[in-house]
A protein has these predicted regions:
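Flexible, low-hydrophobicity surface segments
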Residues: 1-161, 188
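Glycine-rich loop/linker segments at domain edges
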Residues: 6, 12-15, 86-87, 158-212, ...
């Protein structure tokens, strides 16, 4: 190959370094209006009424729109391609503005004004009457018998989805493994581990805040210029949210100042489109503050992993179990896929000689909505699996490195979930190299038997990352290449440049 594999300068490097690259906010027209979202001040309840009297007196206010003015159209926000199978489609549980409040900071109204100051001042003066309910903050409370459903129109309880998977015999359970082990081994040769591990919520904290601006062109098409990772999906969901044909919506994605998965969700583009349509098509700018981003966009999932492990005293892993409980917050977003992906990856690195049992629950709560974030459930899976692995090794007094070498997957393993054979793995070679380069044995001896409040240690972990969600979605992709008269080429594709170098790599591929 002449171009692919060469060390070339990034195609977007010069523009970003010199400041010539244009982001969403750099492209706004001069006469633009400013939008401000009014968020709920309760975590669970119902909006009864608004008093807009004082807010409408603020000079410069053009319009105030409430949940009672917005289209009654539910739409999904996850950045997934459309599935033709109803059971695999993303969950439609959101409206442009929501009367039913499901989290503190829910979007209930919006102000459009001539300037930011007027919009912010008017938003503070809007008075809201609520019918307030007890917040359901934890997964345990949300799953308790008799818990009030946050989305009674689409769910009879607060469980968004329950995913079950096994390794080994069909319908294997951890209790089956215990029974089989006690028949095969002496009881004193078996060690059972029961632990609970947690992962916290994390905000993406991308430098560029979620920002967009929208207008209606002379042909009646609403155009949204947005810092989004998923322009094609935003187009579909915006049309669905407003109840208009997809052909009446256009999404423009300029340069993006970071996303990390938060912008792999439909955020405020539908609302921005609704605002401009409500003021005769005049351009409306909508920027979300850092505080609003943390409470009102997406976070990483907080997941509780209830784990069990069964191991022999010679270091042979017999069975493992994971019950994962994901706090998804007020809306579904990507949650139905992420927790399932977490459970799916938990089973992939180690050989459970008898089998593994995995159950994952994604649950609505009265808290900020969790969605896509780098790793997509795999960081949580790695934390659960590796903590359990270390605890099993510690329980039998075995070196964690040797324990992993004895139990990790090997070439030739056949995944029972999909029948795929592992022809190349390289994990053991990787661990051997890591052990050598960090001087594992020497440091283990050096750091043994320490005392005092400050101590040094050496540890290790392994993880895998995989892609593809068949049969839920085929995730097909396509590209359109147009050769110009001068020999240059225009390439249209679905991959979004968010700093990972996609534009450069695909330019190389097109050149080749």
């Amino acid at each position: 190959m002449k171009v692919v594999g060469q060390g070339l300068n990034r195609v977007d490097a010069y523009g970003k370094v010199t400041g010539e690259a244009k982001y969403s906010a750099d492209l706004e027209p001069r006469d633009i209006l400013h939008g401000k979202v009014i968020h709920s001040t309760i975590a669970n309840g119902l909006v009864k009424s608004f008093d807009l009297t004082e807010a409408l007196k603020v000079p410069g206010v053009v319009k105030i729109l409430t949940c009672f003015d917005a289209p009654d159209c539910q739409f999904p926000t996850a950045g997934h391609p459309w599935s033709v199978e109803a059971k695999h489609q993303d969950i439609c549980d959101r409206r442009v503005l929501n009367q039913r409040v499901r989290l503190y900071g829910d979007d209930i109204a919006a102000v459009v004004a001539e300037n930011e100051v007027a919009a912010a001042q008017a938003a503070r003066l809007v008075k809201v009457e609520y019918e307030e309910y007890e917040p359901i903050v934890t997964v345990k409370a949300a799953m308790a018998p008799g818990a009030t459903p946050l989305h009674p129109d689409i769910r009879k309880d607060n469980v968004i989805v329950h995913s079950h998977m096994t390794m080994g015999p069909k319908d294997f359970t951890f209790e089956d493994g215990l029974k089989q082990a006690k028949e095969k081994y002496k009881e004193e040769d078996l060690v059972e581990i029961n632990e609970v591990y947690d992962t916290p919520r994390i905000s993406h904290c991308h430098i560029e805040l979620p920002v967009s601006w929208a207008y209606v062109d002379v042909n009646g098409k609403v155009t949204v210029v947005s810092s989004t990772q998923i322009p094609h999906i935003v187009r579909r969901c915006t049309a669905q949210a407003l109840g208009i044909p997809i052909g009446k919506v256009r999404i423009i994605k300029p340069y993006i100042g970071g996303g990390f998965g938060n912008k792999q969700d439909v955020l405020y583009e539908p609302l921005n489109a609704f605002l401009t349509m409500s003021v005769g098509g005049r351009p409306v700018r909508l920027e979300i503050s850092r505080e609003e981003t943390i409470s009102g966009t997406r976070t990483r999932h907080a997941i509780e992993g209830v784990c069990r492990g069964l191991v022999t005293k010679d270091g042979t892993v017999l069975a493992r179990q994971l019950d994962a409980y994901a706090n998804n917050g007020g809306y579904a977003s990507h949650g139905h896929a992420i927790c399932a992906n977490c459970g799916n990856v938990f089973k992939d690195l180690y050989r459970d000689r008898l089998g593994a049992e995995i159950d994952c629950w994604t649950v609505y709560t009265s808290s900020p909505t969790a969605g896509a974030m780098r790793g997509y459930g795999i960081p949580q899976a790695a934390w659960f699996a590796e903590c359990l692995t270390d605890d099993m090794a510690t329980a039998i007094g075995m070196d964690p490195y040797e324990f992993r070498m004895k139990n990790c997957m090997e070439d030739g393993f056949v995944d029972p979930a999909n029948g795929i054979t592992f022809h190349t793995y390289g994990l053991k070679k990787c661990m051997e190299a890591g052990k050598k380069y960090i001087h594992w044995d020497e440091k283990r001896k050096e750091y043994a038997n320490q005392t005092g409040p400050v101590r040094r240690g050496v540890g290790m972990s392994i993880f895998c990352y995989k892609t593809g969600v068949h049969p839920i979605s085929l995730e097909t992709s396509s590209v359109r290449m147009v050769l110009n008269q001068d020999g240059s080429m225009q390439v249209s594709m679905g991959a979004t440049e968010i700093g990972q170098g996609a534009d450069t790599v695909f330019s190389q591929m097109a050149s080749e």
